């Protein structure tokens, strides 16, 4: 065992590799960065926010070699004891994180058509990392596995049975690593018994989802077979009547591919505001009186509140509502507006606590006492992946959840 073991966490996206290096003993981040623009002339590597390093026309293995070189420069290469990979979709094959083997890779490849943009990139990262670090144990952490505890009535669509039985069409849910991390932190912050508790976690970012967590398990979530369903998001429509899309196709002559692009890339906050998918831009426009920016935010908030209240029906009790993700952690306005919609659930906002910046970390933002506690808990998916790797890799370390 290395005297100073670290975990390398890798998240390969469709055009980028996000990575971080965490101390096994404390889970403190020692190094983090992103290789972006894969397979283009503009590809670059940025570490700890420093000046970008040119990686023109690099593929995933080239980028990981560059990351490994930076590790070596910092005398960290020999300290890499474990590697954790974020995997987008596990189909119905995995209920928890697993040690990566050839068989596991084959199974991930089998379900990759369910998330082709991400899973194949994830596999490229695994293949490259196994070649670069052949002696290091590697772990796959699935974004969907936390939701494998959903009951059939929560994951089935009202479609002919053969679409589920033959094609696997069902709700899978996403942001599972975030929902799992945040719910576990909430038990401590809210002083709850995990086995007798009910939480709603609202992961709000450019992608956004709600999760109902009952007694430590996901029992309902807003995203579906793909990350398109549920809340309105930065550029995604969220829930939309399929009949409306069929009517648009008929009236405009657009193809299925055209409409997939519309609901994934041209809708949501961007589509309604006509201004931006960035909530920070829209909040500024809100205060300047931009009518469609205000309408986009109001629609976003209405969808969040409606899904939070609806997901509460999957719980036996409601102890807390937790905001996380880039918007959930940082937007005072969105939290305020959502909570104003949820008075029916017994929520009362502490206005001053809600105004505290995210640098204050985990914090309760409802008045005391409150029928339902409302809190902000910054997510840390990298730490959750590292903790899973530490646990599965049998590395002894004084860390929570391990």
From Swiss-Prot:
GO terms for biological process: acetate metabolic process; L-threonine catabolic process to propionate. It catalyses: propanoate + ATP = propanoyl phosphate + ADP. InterPro entries: Ac/propionate_kinase, Aliphatic_acid_kin_short-chain, Aliphatic_acid_kinase_CS, ATPase_NBD, Propionate_kinase. The active site is at 143 (proton donor/acceptor). Pathway: Amino-acid degradation; L-threonine degradation via propanoate pathway; propanoate from L-threonine: step 4/4. Keywords: ATP-binding, Kinase, Magnesium, Metal-binding, Nucleotide-binding, Transferase. Disulfide bonds: none annotated. GO terms for molecular function: acetate kinase activity; ATP binding; metal ion binding; propionate kinase activity. Its cofactor is Mg(2+). Its EC number is 2.7.2.15. GO terms for cellular component: cytosol. ATP binds at residues 11, 18, 175, 203-207, 278-280, 326-330. Catalyzes the conversion of propionyl phosphate and ADP to propionate and ATP. Belongs to the acetokinase family. TdcD subfamily. This is Propionate kinase. It comes from Salmonella typhi.
């Amino acid at each position: 065992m290395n005297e100073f073991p670290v975990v390398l966490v890798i998240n390969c996206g469709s055009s980028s590799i996000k990575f971080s290096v965490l101390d096994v003993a404390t889970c403190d981040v020692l190094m983090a960065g992103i290789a972006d623009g894969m397979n283009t002339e503009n590809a670059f590597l940025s570490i700890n926010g420093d000046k970008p390093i040119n990686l023109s026309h690099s593929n995933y293995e080239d980028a990981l070699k560059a990351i490994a070189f930076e590790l070596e420069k910092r005398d960290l290469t020999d300290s890499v004891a474990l590697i954790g990979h974020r995997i987008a979709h596990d189909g119905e094959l995995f209920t928890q994180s697993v040690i990566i083997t050839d068989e596991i890779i084959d199974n991930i490849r089998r379900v990759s058509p369910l998330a082709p943009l991400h899973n194949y990139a994830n596999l490229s990262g695994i293949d490259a990392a196994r070649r670069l670090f052949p002696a290091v144990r590697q772990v796959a952490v699935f974004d969907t596995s936390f939701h494998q505890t959903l009951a059939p009535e929560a994951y089935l669509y009202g479609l002919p049975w053969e679409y589920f039985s033959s094609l696997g069409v069902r709700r899978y849910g996403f942001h599972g690593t975030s929902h799992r991390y945040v719910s576990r932190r909430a038990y401590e912050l809210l002083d709850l018994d995990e086995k007798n508790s009910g939480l709603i976690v609202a992961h709000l970012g450019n992608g956004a989802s709600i999760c109902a967590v009952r007694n430590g398990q996901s029992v309902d979530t807003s995203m579906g077979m793909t990350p398109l369903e549920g809340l309105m998001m930065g550029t995604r429509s969220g829930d939309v009547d399929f009949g409306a899309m069929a009517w648009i196709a008929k009236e405009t002559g657009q193809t299925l591919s055209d409409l997939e692009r519309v609901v994934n890339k041209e809708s949501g906050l961007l589509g309604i505001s006509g201004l931006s998918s960035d909530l920070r831009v829209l909040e500024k426009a809100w205060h300047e009186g931009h009518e469609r920016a205000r309408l986009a935010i109001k629609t976003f908030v209405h969808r969040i509140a409606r899904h939070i209240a609806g997901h509460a029906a999957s719980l036996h009790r409601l102890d807390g509502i937790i905001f996380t993700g880039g918007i959930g952690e940082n937007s005072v306005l969105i939290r305020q507006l959502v909570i104003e919609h949820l008075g029916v659930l017994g929520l009362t906002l502490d206005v001053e606590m809600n105004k505290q910046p995210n640098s204050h970390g985990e914090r309760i933002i409802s008045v005391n006492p409150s029928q339902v506690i409302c809190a902000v808990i910054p997510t840390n998916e990298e730490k959750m992946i590292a903790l899973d790797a530490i646990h599965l890799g049998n590395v002894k370390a004084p860390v929570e959840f391990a």
